[in-house]
Amino acid sequence: MMKKYYESDADLSVLSGKKIAVIGYGSQGRGQSLNLRDSGLDVIIGLRKGKSWDAAAKDGMNVMTVAEAAKKADIIQILLPDELQAAVYKNEILPHLSENKVLMFSHGFNIHFGQIQPPGNVDVIMVAPKGPGFMVRRQYEEGKGVPALIAIHQDHTCKAHKTALAYAKGIGATRAVVLETTFREETETDLFGEQAVLCGGTASLIKAGFETLVDAGYAPEMAYLEVCHELKLIVDLIYEGGLTNMRQYVSNTAQYGDMTRGPRVIGPEAYEAMEEILAEIQSGEFAKEWMLENMVNRPVFNALTKADEEHLLEETGKEVRAMMPQFRK
């Protein structure tokens, strides 16, 4: 059973007098830093000059270079894309990572796969909200919170756990629930979820269903509505109460088809593929592949992205959404 923590388990005063540098101002960077600031904490933003710098300044944040932020901060939260973290850490953070500082992440990729290897005289922790940055911010503003994971990789000061919980409280996570995990578990399950179910599995299932209907002569608009547009309605029901809840709201015909035909779509071959995907993650094969892909300017990534953007599914989706007032800007 995972350990769980709530508001009363975390002490925000642990961060009193501490300067927190958030490196990056994308979705998570913005959401977390604004919440920390509104929780009364001392936050600075480390960035390179550009749109993110301007956005952070417009939000009233104290913005400076990454190196300046790392030098001034007691706690350094790296919220850059995985593929950029190692270089920024080596060139702009490590020179200022003095004893007893705290190095923090919201995903364990670079620590777990050895892309970043911190010195032994600092704390290394993770606070990972289980939701996108805009939702972290929205829930906080509504007096709620997005659940989060915490993990301790290195506890030089013997205060790492309290620091992680305090930070989680600062971004509003303890209003929901904070669960304790490890860098390994968070990294491997997160990557697997993205690849096999949430992004890869779902996207491939939608495209396969769409293509099957269109190839059989059905209108692309009908195919889109049935296999993509309506998916949100089903996912919302599952999110609210699991598969059982979803099945209480669909027809008996739909439920019977679900239980008898679904396993034919996701059958033994799918399980074998999932096991292979998990093994590639666990061995570090995927991480190595992704790092190499970035070293050669992402030829596979760019080609696959372009192909999906030009897929009939995407063109049809634009046309269908244009018919509906709620999607008109």
Curated annotation (Swiss-Prot):
Catalyzed reaction equations: (2R)-2,3-dihydroxy-3-methylbutanoate + NADP(+) = (2S)-2-acetolactate + NADPH + H(+); (2R,3R)-2,3-dihydroxy-3-methylpentanoate + NADP(+) = (S)-2-ethyl-2-hydroxy-3-oxobutanoate + NADPH + H(+)
Catalytic EC class: oxidoreductase
EC nos: 1.1.1.86
Residues given in the record as Mg(2+) 1 binding sites: 190, 194
Record-listed NADP(+) binding positions: 25-28, 48, 52, 82-85, 133
Binding-site positions, Mg(2+) 2: 190, 226, 230
Pathway the protein takes part in: Amino-acid biosynthesis; L-isoleucine biosynthesis; L-isoleucine from 2-oxobutanoate: step 2/4; Amino-acid biosynthesis; L-valine biosynthesis; L-valine from pyruvate: step 2/4
Annotated binding of substrate, by residue: 251
Cofactor(s) recorded in Swiss-Prot or TrEMBL: Mg(2+)
Keyword set includes NAD: no
Pfam families: KARI_C, KARI_N
Cofactor binding note: Binds 2 magnesium ions per subunit.
Start and end residues of each KARI N-terminal Rossmann domain: 2-181
PROSITE patterns reported in the protein's UniProt record: KARI_C, KARI_N
GO molecular function: ketol-acid reductoisomerase activity; magnesium ion binding; NADP binding
GO biological process annotation, one example: L-valine biosynthetic process
KARI C-terminal knotted domain boundaries: 182-327
PANTHER family xrefs: KETOL-ACID REDUCTOISOMERASE, MITOCHONDRIAL
Annotated function: Involved in the biosynthesis of branched-chain amino acids (BCAA). Catalyzes an alkyl-migration followed by a ketol-acid reduction of (S)-2-acetolactate (S2AL) to yield (R)-2,3-dihydroxy-isovalerate. In the isomerase reaction, S2AL is rearranged via a Mg-dependent methyl migration to produce 3-hydroxy-3-methyl-2-ketobutyrate (HMKB). In the reductase reaction, this 2-ketoacid undergoes a metal-dependent reduction by NADPH to yield (R)-2,3-dihydroxy-isovalerate.
Similarity section: Belongs to the ketol-acid reductoisomerase family.
Protein name according to UniProt: Ketol-acid reductoisomerase (NADP(+))
